[in-house]
Swiss-Prot record:
The keyword Transmembrane applies. Belongs to the PsbX family. Type 2 subfamily. GO terms for cellular component: photosystem II; plasma membrane-derived thylakoid membrane. Its main location: membrane. GO terms for biological process: photosynthesis. This is Photosystem II reaction center X protein. PSII consists of a core antenna complex that captures photons, and an electron transfer chain that converts photonic excitation into a charge separation. PSII forms dimeric complexes. It is found in: Cellular thylakoid membrane. Involved in the binding and/or turnover of quinones at the Q(B) site of Photosystem II. Keywords: Membrane, Photosynthesis, Photosystem II, Thylakoid, Transmembrane, Transmembrane helix. It comes from Prochlorococcus marinus (strain SARG / CCMP1375 / SS120). It is a single-pass membrane protein. It holds the Pfam family PsbX.
Length: 55
């Protein structure tokens, strides 16, 4: 049913491609703004803790 609604509505491939590119761009932006800084912070804390325990 959804297949018929999607292609019966006249949605072009260009619109679907633009939407997919936008979604991928959003994922990359989220990774750059949220995941990378959080991972960097956690690695920094982990390394700092390991150095303090080694003393």
């Amino acid at each position: 049913m959804a297949f018929t609604l999607l292609f019966g509505a006249g949605v072009s491939g260009d619109v679907a491609t633009a939407s997919a590119v936008g979604m991928i761009g959003s994922f990359l932006a989220a990774a750059a703004l949220i995941v990378v800084p959080a991972a960097s912070f956690l690695l920094w804390v982990s390394q700092k803790d390991a150095l303090e325990r080694g003393r």
